Swiss-Prot record:
GO terms for biological process: urea catabolic process. Keywords: Cytoplasm, Hydrolase, Metal-binding, Nickel. GO terms for molecular function: nickel cation binding; urease activity. This is Urease subunit alpha. Belongs to the metallo-dependent hydrolases superfamily. Urease alpha subunit family. The active site is at 325 (proton donor). It holds the Pfam family Amidohydro_1. Ni(2+) 1 binds at residues 139, 141, 222, 365. One of its GO terms (cellular component) is cytoplasm. Pathway: Nitrogen metabolism; urea degradation; CO(2) and NH(3) from urea (urease route): step 1/1. The modification N6-carboxylysine is found at residue 222. Residues 134-572 form the Urease domain.
Length: 572
């Protein structure tokens, strides 16, 4: 039998079992755990498109029609990185969803084929490339629509949050308040190649005004201290969420005016809730909001300006905070408010809590103390910093960082999907889910995608000069593709709403073009459901020194002076 060297095979068909891939310029190494393309019984039946290659009529391309099972699109020889595994596979897409992950080809001439290539099948060659599920940013201030373009080009395909544009309330809080604004924002969402869900304002002590927002189409409610996150408002908001199977996200009381962290925990009453920017620089009970990391019903997340902890982190935060929360540097009380939120001890501990799997999610806090295009980038910078400072995780050996990689990819994919009741549609590369897929060259993993698919259509890609004779000449930059235009846009993206809104027929009432999907299964979600990130330690924060301990272990680390995925990739 003819043989080929491992290197030559990887260069031709991509890595296979036992091969390792470095993720961009980080120190993280992924090792292929399984190769689904070998289901034919071994090597030799791989599919590849191109002149003289195998995906040709009568070879790896069958005669089967779409009705007979041929796929719409097949991504060949992809290295899949997801919470469930790091595997080599072909991926079949049909009707805008993932139809199969396995072995592609022609079942009439090849054994073991479960993804049929036919004359009606498009091919995206992923040999040597990494494929991930589209990212989810669950902390969006919808301040300007251009955020969506920026996020999509970074690999984010779902944005959850609130706002109405650059209104003062939106600059500070992630709320789309009231039925009129909710209707307008749902109508605006039709224009963008992005899955979108809105949060209403949850700060009220009586339920009627909250119920009308749920029925108008929000997927949950946001409690924000700038609107008054009192125990009364918290309790009322939680009652409404329980009645409607929606989520509550909380930005608690930094000043401890209406109560301390213990009072907030008591008002929540053991019910599930999303804790935004759990460390506290983004807001929350000072100095010990990190206490909630030890509560099973709090689903903790970080926003990206504090991630990872670097020598510049503290300096930039005061000015950011003053702008975002409409504060005046000439007023001593405003300045004290800002400074109370910025503590190097808790910021340093935040990195380690992520590495332990105790903080479950990552998000941006877009234009409101966070950078919308850096959720994925900051996640992998944190993973690399923790490997450099803490070494390999106990679950990982000397050969690879697979467990750490799965832990960190889950923070911006499956875990926010579970927390917000949308994991039936998005959050992972699994059969039946919406085909929101990001393709990366390994050298650019986590920082600059090669292309982003929305609902099976290419929505954005790194594309060269449109007047060039081939697609690659400079200037290469992100350009919208056909999936981002016309009727294709509306059919390639989802708008998430509440079950109550779906039952009320908001799509017809508001004249919405996009397909709606109702959030569900939220109220029973707990920390233990956060994939690879369910550790719930006993938390202690010293009120005088701000030192942090988890299960008695002191959590501290140095600020980084160098990071991967940084200036090397952003020369211009």
């Amino acid at each position: 039998m003819a043989t080929v060297s491992r290197r030559a095979y990887a260069e031709m068909f991509g890595p296979t079992v036992g091969d390792r891939v470095r993720l961009a310029d980080t120190g993280l190494v992924a090792e292929v755990e399984q190769d689904f393309t070998l289901r034919a019984g071994g090597y030799g039946e791989e599919v590849k498109f191109g002149g003289g290659k195998t995906i040709r009529d009568g070879m790896a391309q069958s005669q089967r029609t779409r009705a007979e099972g041929a796929m719409d699109t097949v991504l060949t020889n992809a290295l899949v990185i997801d919470h469930w595994g790091i595997v080599k596979a072909d991926i079949g897409l049909k009707d805008g969803r993932v139809a199969a992950i396995g072995k592609a080809g022609n079942p009439d001439t090849q054994p073991g084929v479960d993804i049929v290539i036919g004359p009606g099948t498009e091919i995206i060659s992923c040999e040597g490339n990494i494929v991930t599920a589209g990212g989810i940013d669950s902390h969006i201030h919808f301040i300007c629509p251009q955020q969506i373009e920026e996020a999509l080009a970074s690999g984010i395909t779902t944005m959850l949050g609130g706002g109405t544009g650059p209104a003062t309330g939106t600059l500070a809080t992630t709320c789309t308040p009231g039925p009129w604004h909710i209707e307008r924002m749902l109508q605006a969402a039709d224009a963008f190649p992005m899955n979108i869900g809105f949060l209403g304002k949850g700060n009220a002590s009586l339920p009627a005004a909250l119920h009308e927002q749920i029925e108008a189409g929000v997927i949950g409610l946001k409690l924000h201290e700038d609107w008054g996150t009192t125990p009364s408002a918290i309790s009322n908001c939680m009652d409404v969420a329980d009645a409607t199977d929606t989520q509550v996200a909380i930005h608690s009381d930094t000043l401890n005016e209406s109560g301390f962290v213990e009072n907030t925990i008591a008002a929540v009453g053991g019910r599930g809730i999303c804790a935004f920017h759990t460390e506290g620089a983004g807001g929350g009970h000072a100095p010990d909001i990190l206490r909630v990391v030890g509560e099973d019903n709090f689903l903790p997340s970080s926003t990206n300006p504090t991630m990872p902890y670097t020598r510049n982190t503290l300096d930039e935060h005061v000015d950011m905070l003053m702008v975002c929360h409409h504060l005046d540097a000439a007023i001593a009380e405003d300045l004290a408010f800002a400074e109370s939120r910025i503590r190097k001890e808790t910021i340093a501990a935040e990195d380690i809590l992520h590495d332990l799997g105790a903080i479950s999610m990552m998000s941006s806090d877009s234009q409101a103390m966070g950078r919308v295009g850096e959720v994925i980038l900051r996640t992998w910078q944190t993973a690399d910093k923790m490997k450099q400072q803490r070494g390999a995780l106990p679950e990982d050996g000397a050969r690879n960082d697979n467990h750490r990689i799965k832990r960190y990819v889950a923070k911006y994919t499956i875990n926010p999907a579970i927390a917000h009741g949308i994991s039936h549609d998005v959050g992972s590369l699994e059969v039946g889910k919406w085909a929101d897929i990001v393709v990366w060259k390994p050298a650019f993993f986590g920082v600059k995608p090669a292309m982003v698919l929305k609902g099976g259509s290419i929505a954005v890609a790194a594309m060269g000069d449109p007047n060039a004779s081939i697609p690659t000449p400079q200037p290469v930059h992100y350009r919208p593709m056909f999936g981002a235009f016309g009727g294709s846009l509306a059919r390639s993206s989802l708008t998430f709403v509440s079950q109550a809104a779906m039952a009320a027929g908001v799509r017809e009432r508001f004249g919405l073009a996009k397909q709606l999907s109702a959030v569900r299964g939220i109220r029973g979600v707990r920390k233990q459901h956060m994939v690879h990130n369910g550790y719930t330690p006993r938390m202690e924060i010293d009120a005088q020194t701000y030192t942090v301990r988890a299960d008695g272990q002191l959590l501290t680390c140095e600020s980084a002076t160098r990071l991967p995925l940084a200036q090397r990739y952003f020369l211009f």
